[in-house]
């Protein structure tokens, strides 16, 4: 029996990772207000890892309730610098401010992936990467944002390491798939255990 897989994301990057791994799936967007889910979590002292996991779980459960019998993959990623959490920048000025704030420091990417079926969580996982950014001057940041354009608005931190964003870093500790927002190896192992893919 083949299990239907659904990715609860319209992210072209996450879709490409699964397609490149030879996984057959469909996509569906979750109907949740991420900021409304996050707010009480931060007030109660949740860690950035907790927030990523809870958001991934909310997405997976929402989509699984609309796709009976399917195994749904929910994902989320948070960027934290100390106690501060960053979101995708809403405009180029916000992207510039984010880069200035994380320049010369080590921030953390927390990537969560959750599997759900029929409104119930089957499995959850969080991977962490530590990203040390070079000291960037304002001129370089401006040129970088000018070169990458709207790509700066599509990722938390205003960068993508799979493109020119890699030039922003002096050191990276963590799995590539964690950095791009989908901890693929643990996910594939769990999909095999759940008999969703051949293994």
Curated annotation (Swiss-Prot):
Domain of life according to the entry: Bacteria
Alphabetical UniProt keywords: Cytoplasm, Hydrolase, Nucleotide metabolism
GO process annotations (BP): nucleotide metabolic process
Site positions per UniProt: Important for substrate specificity: 13, 77, 162
One Gene Ontology term of the molecular function aspect: nucleoside triphosphate diphosphatase activity
Gene3D superfamilies the record matches: 3.90.950.10
SUPFAM superfamilies xref list: ITPase-like
Enzyme's top EC category: hydrolase
HAMAP family: Maf
Descriptive protein name: 7-methyl-GTP pyrophosphatase
